[in-house]
Amino acid sequence: MSITKDQIIEAVASMSVMEVVELIEAMEEKFGVSAAAAVMAGPAAAEAVEEKTEFDVVLTAAGANKVAVIKAVRGATGLGLKEAKDLVEAAPANLKEAVSKDEAEALKKELEAAGASVEIK
């Protein structure tokens, strides 16, 4: 006499939660498997977004202390006084393009300390 799938489903449906947990544990031991969900490694994992390696530092506003910002821009870019002043007054403007994340963060920190508003894109 064999048991049908429907009979097994009915038997499990009538069990308490603790009984179902015990049944699952017994089945894991008997068949050497785990009831944990299998992780599918497929094309979705291969299409993961690549981490950006080059960043642009954009001066969005000079802030109240424009002189300090101009000095910081001169030091960071190597521009002359007039060019740095024109760049600061033309905000929003790209200060540096295609720089590393560390360099972009350092430049942002330096300019914000001088009173500027800076974005990294």
Swiss-Prot record:
Name-wise, this protein is Large ribosomal subunit protein bL12
Question: What SUPFAM superfamilies does its record include?
Answer: ClpS-like, Ribosomal protein L7/12, oligomerisation (N-terminal) domain
Record NCBIfam families: L12 (TIGR00855)
Ranges that cross the membrane: none
The record's function comment reads: Forms part of the ribosomal stalk which helps the ribosome interact with GTP-bound translation factors. Is thus essential for accurate translation.
Q: Which InterPro entries match?
A: Ribosomal_bL12, Ribosomal_bL12_C, Ribosomal_bL12_C/ClpS-like, Ribosomal_bL12_oligo, Ribosomal_bL12_oligo_N_sf
Family, similarity comment: Belongs to the bacterial ribosomal protein bL12 family.
Gene Ontology cellular component terms for the protein in this record: cytosolic large ribosomal subunit
Oligomeric and partner information: Homodimer. Part of the ribosomal stalk of the 50S ribosomal subunit. Forms a multimeric L10(L12)X complex, where L10 forms an elongated spine to which 2 to 4 L12 dimers bind in a sequential fashion. Binds GTP-bound translation factors.
GO BP term (any one): translation
Q: Does the keyword NADP apply?
A: no
State the source organism's domain of life: Bacteria
A single GO molecular-function term is: structural constituent of ribosome
What taxonomic ancestry is recorded? Bacteria, Pseudomonadati, Pseudomonadota, Gammaproteobacteria, Aeromonadales
Keyword annotations of the record = Ribonucleoprotein, Ribosomal protein
